[in-house]
Amino acid sequence: MVASGLNGTFGTPFAWMPDSTALIAYTVPANRGPAPVAGDTPTGPVVQESAGRSSAARTYEDLLGDAQDEALFDHYFTGQLVRIALSGAARPIGAPGLITEFSVSPDGRYLLTERLKRPYSYLLPARYFPTEIAVATIDGQRVRTLVDRPLADDLPVDFDAAVKGPREAMWRSDAPATLVWAEALDGGNPRAKVAFHDVVKMQAAPFEAAPVDLAMTPARYATTFWGDDGFAMVVDREWRSRTEHRLAVAPARPGQARTLLTRNYQDQYGDPGRPVVESNAAGKPVMRFTPDHKAVYVTGDGATKAGAFPFLATLPLTGGEQTRLWSAKPPYYETVVAMLDDTGQRILTRRESAKLAPNYVVRSVRGGSAKPVTAFADPAPVFAGVTQRTITYPRADGLALSGSLYLPAGYDAKRDGPLPTLLWAYPAEFTDAKVAGQTVDQGNRFVRPRGISHLFLLTQGYAILDNPAMPIIGEGGTEANDTYVKQLQQNAQAAVDAVVKLGVADRTRMAVGGHSYGAFMTANLLAHTDLFRAGIARSGAYNRTLTPFGFQAEQRTYWQATRPIPK
């Protein structure tokens, strides 16, 4: 139907029209031609201009580097939006461009697009390039330009930094054609001392009336769960404190948000779950209400020290306590895939255990019956004899840690003695020691290695402590990375001592490994401890003078961290 092919460089290259009569597709321009080839003779130097102002920018990889890169970027990423009828007839919409996002309004009359423009940057990724967000008719006639912003090269290095002006534009799922977007109230600087950091705005078609403020958020806007005129849920998050707010709003009465809950979003035990969403008649995601319309359904992972036991519950629109309708029971890990009726009494779940491969089940909540729908077999029965259990152990300062211990099939500790052991880990930063110390038993999960998994070493006689907790904690205004090495040493020492004490690991044959930031961890443990004979540092960055404007979860610049600047 599209001879030139789809262009998936920016993601999924098609979307259905709400009435399912046609597709909107991002296609390769028909006249694209061959890719540009660089000449053997340089045409000139690479020139970068300074605007005469200081600007910190994180270190990124795989950036554009010269005019040839720019030409290749244009060649491969430029696309043409096309409307394709079920008959196969195709009609172009608007002009070709670097269209990073596109979506059709629920009534099928308008098209929201986000496209990149020149000049490009050699220091920043494409998401910071000059951007135009606009609304057109479904035939491509421009109706409204929401924003046409320049290169975002003046943002603070903080994670919650945001561009000035409209961003994160979307359609309201439960209205015919209402444009929704967020704007920073703090100039894009999350450190600004303001009561509200973002405002969420709405504007209904034909986009001539002034926008209205749906809600102002205490932290940086994250997402919205749409319902109807009377209820929607706006979520924001603040990285520095790991705080999340969930606000109840009534789109028909904008500006009257009320707080449903405030929580630490790293808190596994206190995770209330997320609203159940379904596709409405227009194919847009909306929350699922109870029949009396007094609550919405929510699902969550149900993390506890004894294990994760997913649940289905209802959350009153007025807030307050949830009502649990169903939760998984040992020895299973069973997630809710879909609700099969309006009352939450008939559900489709995906059930697994340490020994049983995941399969789908239709479950009667009230009656308790479970009818298998699929019968998928163990994809790697050679690993069926591998034993796995969650072990818990204390750090030197008393913090509870945990990890998943895997032992080879047929292994007997008394008969075979201690094994060479690999710790495969990844550090995580926390602002609350109680949250960092949460342990969740993984014994009800079905685990089989695939790809380049380190778990394949089980076939070679290794014991593996997978994902041993490596928390790096900064409480009370302190920065976690100020004690990174010390806490890393404590975490590793506790893990090694734990597996040696169990009699399954040989202290003289310990190895450590990790990917990316786990590779950085590996290098530090090899340099600062004598716990390990070898390490696997896979795809890491190790020289922090090459990432002076922040890395991973570190928001400070190198100079702020090494010589703190007075507040």
Task: Label each region the model flagged.
Residues T374-G417:
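N-terminal cap/lid segment of alpha/beta-hydrolase-fold proteins
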Residues T21, P420, R533:
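Conserved acidic residues
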